[in-house]
From Swiss-Prot:
Its membrane topology: Multi-pass membrane protein
Spans through the membrane: 57-77, 85-105, 133-153, 170-190, 227-247, 275-295, 304-324
Official protein name in the record: Vomeronasal type-1 receptor 1
Gene transcribed to yield this protein: VN1R1
Organism name: Gorilla gorilla gorilla
Cytoplasmic compartment spans: 78-84, 154-169, 248-274, 325-353
Free-text function comment from the UniProt entry: Putative pheromone receptor.
Subcellular location: Cell membrane
Pfam families: V1R
Key words of the record: Cell membrane, G-protein coupled receptor, Glycoprotein, Membrane, Pheromone response, Receptor, Transducer, Transmembrane, Transmembrane helix
Sequence ranges on the Extracellular membrane side: 1-56, 106-132, 191-226, 296-303
Length: 353
């Protein structure tokens, strides 16, 4: 008796839960929709929200750990490597991407769509785009730095400069300033969440909306993504140079030693492989994200699944790249082992900051 009653009440409770947490102004709802459609829709949105939540939370933790580790090296008096300076900026840019895109999209997936006003939406989109472009520029800088370090004949006058921390800091600063200025146009295009008052907005991202004419959207997309495609082309060229140099170097080593010595990869080779993994993954997912972004910008009222997939693809690299760096950096494993050993030998020892 009780079981039959619960079976009858379950669809009604699910529909009440959906209507309670999800706004009825959304374009996804229809007056003639069956209650079972509400169940499937609620399950799909909760599943998307959980995916956003896990990916964003894990990525923020990984990037925060990297930032703390690099700052710890600096504060303890040790000297940072030139690549550490670049990777610290990359971790900061990735954190911005996850914080200003992943968190709002997670809230929108769970039905919290109207927490941001018009000003909040503008700055969330602005900081997200700045973080995305800085991440792209930083990857290009890291790729070019390693290519010149492996093969100085590419640009001989840069060989000495790339060893200077001041020069690396200046290059990292150049990765920020242009994008801080160029992305100011986002403040004019983004509005608050889509509702009955601004139903003429072109694209709805769940928590914010985008409004512009078709002609202006196409022009903005071309001007916005042209530097990105140039940067991706530079990545391909620098990565190809590194692959060619490593292949030629491997052939020379095998010829000189005739395979009598153990071919143990050097530190530069391991670093280059790590950078190649980062660059290749960034290239693939950023290209897919750019295509989806252009699609949602040019096409009127894109499907919500396109918007969700665009956010997932955009967050893939920022959420996984810190763990590639953590696993490839031997200093981190040595640091964790030292902390564990100290805690085992001196369990009552309190380490002062």
């Amino acid at each position: 008796m009780v079981g039959d009653t619960l079976k009858l009440l379950s669809p009604l409770m699910t529909r009440y839960f959906f209507l309670l947490f999800y706004s009825t102004d959304s374009s996804d709802l229809n007056e003639n929709q069956h209650p079972l459609d509400f169940d499937e829709m609620a399950f799909g949105k909760v599943k998307s929200g959980i995916s956003f939540l896990i990916q964003t939370g894990v990525g923020i933790l990984g990037n925060s750990f990297l930032l703390c580790f690099y700052n710890l090296i600096l504060f303890t008096g040790h000297k940072l490597r030139p690549t550490d300076l670049i990777l610290s900026h990359l971790a900061l840019a990735n954190s911005m991407v996850l914080f200003f895109k992943g968190i709002p999209q997670t809230m929108a997936a769970f039905g919290l769509k109207y927490l941001l006003n018009d000003t909040g939406c503008k700055f969330v989109f602005y900081y997200h785009r700045v973080g995305t472009r800085v991440s792209l520029s930083t990857i290009c800088l890291l790729n070019g730095f390693q290519a010149i370090k492996l093969n100085p004949s590419i640009c001989r006058w840069m060989e000495i400069k790339i060893r200077s921390p001041r020069f690396i800091d200046f290059c990292c600063l150049l990765c920020w300033v242009p994008h801080v200025l160029m992305n100011a146009s986002v403040l004019l295009l983004v509005n608050g969440p889509l509702n009955s008052k601004n139903s003429s907005a072109k694209n709805n991202y769940g928590y914010c909306s985008y409004k512009a004419s078709k002609r202006f959207s196409s022009l903005h997309a071309v001007l916005y993504f042209s530097p990105d495609f140039m940067s991706l082309g530079f990545m391909v060229w620098a990565s190809g140079s590194m692959v060619f140099f490593l292949y030629r170097h491997k052939q020379q080593v095998q010829h000189n030693h005739s395979n009598r010595l153990s071919c143990r990869p050097s530190q530069e080779t391991r670093a280059t492989r790590t950078i190649m993994v980062l660059v290749s993954s960034f290239f693939v997912f950023y290209s897919v994200h750019s295509f989806l972004t252009i699609w949602t910008t040019v096409v009127a009222n894109p499907g919500q699944w396109i918007v969700n997939n665009s956010v997932l693809v955009a967050s893939y690299f920022p959420s996984r790249s810190p763990f590639v760096l953590i696993m490839s950096d031997t200093r981190i494993s040595q640091f964790c082992f030292a902390c564990r050993t100290r805690k085992t030998l001196f369990p009552n020892l309190v380490v002062m900051p």
